[in-house]
Amino acid sequence: MNVIRKLLTAVSLWACLSCIQAKAQTTTLFSDNFQSGSYSTWTMSGTGYDAVNTYLGNVSMRLNGLRQGTKALSSQGYTNVSLSMDMGALYLVQGDYCYAEYSTNGGTSWNTLVLVGDGEDSGALKRGTVSTGLDNNANLRVRFRSYTLYGHYCYGDNVVLTGMPATDGIYDPLSGNGNVSRSALTASFLTGSSTLNLMNFSHYALPSGAANPANTFQGRLTLYGEATSGSATEVGGNNNLPYYSQAQHLPEFEFDFVQNGTHFIPVTRGKIAGTHPSWTYILEPGRVWNENGDSGYSRVAFPFALQERGSDCMWNGVMTFLFKDDGSVSDLAYQIASETCYYLKVNFWGRLDAAYTPATISGAATIRNSYEAEVSRRMPTKPLSALATDYPGSGVTVANIGSDVTAAHMSIYGVAYNGVHYAGGCQTRYGTYPFCEVLDVPSYSTAKSVHGGYGLMRLEQKYAGTQRTLGIDDWVSECTGTQWDAPTFEQALDMATGNYTSAGTTTDEASQAMADGFFKVGTHAQKAGFACSYPYKTTPGTKFVYHTTDTYLLGRAMGQYYKSQAGSGADFFNDVMVDEIYRPLGLSPTSHVSSRTQDTAAQPFAGYGLVYVRDDVVKLGEFLNKAQGKIQGTQTLDAVMVTATLSLGSGGLQAGSAADRYNNGFWYYDLKQDTHNYGCSTAKWVPYMSGYGGISVVLLPNGMVYYQFSDNGQLTWGKSAIELNKIAAMCP
């Protein structure tokens, strides 16, 4: 063998690789010059012999007979891909050949890159290079092959695969090459029959080495065995799970999805009613990628939530499976290990048979474009810890923010300030939730501020005259009693109709009669019948008694009034709340669906029944606190009501202690009366939205919006306010 020639070739290759690495956009995806003295990662086959050949310090793969060494490679996520291979030979005779070959289809067919025959067997290496047809391919193969008599040798050496990360033509491209070390949810597991156990959510997450997907999903995903498979275990001592029918089983699953680059988008967003007696689905966008160990399949992981039917409790999880363009699909694995629910904490997990039916989805391009717009409109996000680095002189102790709530019961929390969303939370019983940006949280009674408060403020702004003083009985036909002659829309919003059973602030709300007569019934006639049945006790507008029923009646009244203006087919929630507020604000499609009565009335609950992702929460808070009810400079909410909400003064009604009030669907707390000295010389009433179990969205007077969604009955946020006051004073 011509050793000098070979060594010069190796030096030249090293110099070439040094140049390649100096180019910022070029990456070496694979290289092997066998200088390690091993080719153990190659697959050897055929008759004949192979050996490590070492001569004067240089190493190569030596083959003779009918022998070949094969290596699987991937260029997934890369363009401008180039492959080079060297082949040399000694002692060939006529009919002997040595091949360096590559395949673009997983080895089904092969292309010759270098061919060495008799007369070219001086030992010098012959190089072949190809730079076309190799881009974005997870199924590349290379091989060295001998077709010789025994003792006639082929020498394979210096395999180099390079490429440039794909940045164009694919939405949100990945930079990995598919080299992922996976110990759970492997391809063999998902295509096998082993039992699934609960595990850290990192196994469901997009890994750092993930490559762009080689397959594209568009069509229907159907699951089988939902009614008989699956596990659910209650966490804690409430022992409420036995009261839920078919609790361990998922609802039936048959939904369409569209892929956009590395993102996996459900066609149907927001809560999906279904027929399961206990749970409804919410599907969120996930990710698609390739891993070299998945045998040409692409891998999907997407978040989903189960919501309690007729109520707001929410459990968040992830589903994952493998698929190919031809409809091949693995089993689907799923896991839930966190919730926002005060009385029922559950882990769900299981594996189900799946089917993928490729199909052209109507409006797929619109779905993709809308999704890209949705993502682009999210407020820029930083981890909560960045508050300390962004405001280094403040002395803020970030660990104290959110500390009013026991960490194990916190779903999400964060702060919006100066155009940045500082986000925390997303911890589960099994690690960090991998899709925090679309973790679904229930509104509970924050809907009273949003649907009730913003809804009436919009109605007041939208039409001439005064709508907030309209009578409830004029627009809710079920309220026929004389006790409803006087209460107005705004008094229902204030929960000050004067109609109640007990004068205690929350006694009626917490009663069994309320649970049985309102929360557990499904039709508008039942809900309205109960809501209208409270007797007269005092003059409307003079006493606060917490009644979700009042907000329900307000929602019905606003809806009926809107129909009188816009036509019998009009829908206040869809037409006004979604089209005139949510969409212009850039809220997620998840927020565009409200819980409704299960009848032809389809009446939105108004006082609860909304779903948010964290970006929705900060936008809804800033809509009032920062934009004062304006969208892109246009007054969308009534300015008078906005001012009365943000600057309470002597308004509102006492709602508990002297430091608590309620007005226009918002709670208020007076910082002047707090045990911490904020330096307020006069009363400083802070409006906030509040929800059952531990939900607060606080419109702080320093321009911040603080939120926390938790489920341990801890509603206070004072420790967070103290820290945020260090960054910007509440009472300057």
Model-derived regions, located:
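Active-site helix/loop module of the DD-peptidase/beta-lactamase fold
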Residues: 180-202, 461-500, 533-536, 563-607, ...
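Extracellular carbohydrate recognition and processing domains
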Residues: 108-135
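Extracellular carbohydrate recognition
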Residues: 95, 147-163
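Penicillin-binding protein/beta-lactamase superfamily catalytic region
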Residues: 525-535, 539-544, 562-568, 591-700, ...
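Extracellular glycan-recognition surfaces and repeat-rich motifs
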Residues: 26-66
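Active-site-adjacent helix/loop patches that line small-molecule binding or acyl-intermediate pockets
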Residues: 388-413, 480-587, 612-618, 622-626
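Active-site SXXK
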Residues: 442-468, 492, 554-558, 617-624
